[in-house]
């Protein structure tokens, strides 16, 4: 038994050295907590622009439009947003195509905070291209999605309920789908409300961090 003690000592020493050189164990939940905090920061930054029309004065926002707003929110928190340029005249459509190219667009699932909501047919002569984009701030108990976006009125909130896309208000009189397009002679049927014009969600956060 005395002869085995040096061997046991060497084994214990080796285990100690290897343990000291290994990286600290981090649970997956820690990463998720960090992501949740960053997503909340993005939402709060987006909400801080509410009521603003000229947002291009902020050094992270390059254009006073819907895509310039959402990209600027991410850039303001030091996310490096680099996008490929596709053959499309709508910047929101270009943003959508970038996310789609990496598999970060989805439909039919509950959106996460700071995810993007893409819309089509919000302007005349837009074809089937994405023409508008906003950022999800929360999902209410009735599945109404609250979105902060930049429009002709500046930065504001709109609501969208895909369970009842053709209803402007619910039975209690609360708005569940905001008007996103004005009615004109060439407006398609059922193409005025946010729920009617919604196309796809996009995860810009994961696109930038994966």
Model regions and ranges:
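N-terminal capping segments
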Residues: 22-88, 100, 188-210
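Residue-level signal for mature regions of secreted extracellular proteins and peptides
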Residues: 14-15
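C-terminal motif of bacterial Sec signal peptides marking the signal peptidase cleavage site
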Residues: 18-20
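Solvent-exposed, non-transmembrane amphipathic alpha-helical segments
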Residues: 62, 66, 89-90, 94, ...
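...with weaker cross-activation on analogous glycine-rich loops/strands in unrelated enzymes
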Residues: 31, 82-158
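Aromatic- and glycine-rich peptidoglycan recognition patches
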Residues: 30-31, 127-210
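Bacterial N-terminal signal peptides that target proteins for export
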Residues: 1-9
């Amino acid at each position: 038994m005395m002869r085995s003690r040096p061997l046991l000592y060497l084994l214990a020493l080796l285990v100690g050295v290897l343990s000291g050189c290994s990286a600290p164990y981090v649970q997956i939940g820690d990463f998720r907590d960090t992501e949740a905090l960053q997503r909340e920061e993005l939402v709060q930054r987006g909400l801080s622009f509410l009521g603003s029309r000229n947002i291009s004065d902020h050094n992270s926002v390059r254009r006073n439009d819907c895509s310039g707003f959402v990209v600027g929110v991410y850039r303001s928190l030091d996310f490096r947003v680099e996008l490929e340029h596709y053959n499309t005249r709508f910047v929101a459509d270009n943003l959508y195509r970038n996310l789609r190219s990496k598999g970060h667009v989805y439909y039919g699932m509950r959106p996460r905070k700071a995810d993007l909501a893409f819309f089509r047919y919000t302007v005349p002569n837009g074809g089937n291209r994405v023409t508008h984009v906003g950022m999800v701030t929360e999902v209410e108990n009735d599945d109404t999605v609250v979105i902060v976006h930049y429009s002709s009125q500046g930065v504001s909130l709109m609501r969208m309920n895909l369970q009842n896309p053709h209803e402007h208000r619910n039975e209690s009189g609360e708005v569940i789908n905001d008007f996103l397009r004005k009615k004109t002679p060439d407006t398609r049927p059922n193409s005025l409300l946010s729920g009617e014009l919604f196309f796809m969600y996009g995860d810009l956060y994961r696109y930038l961090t994966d």
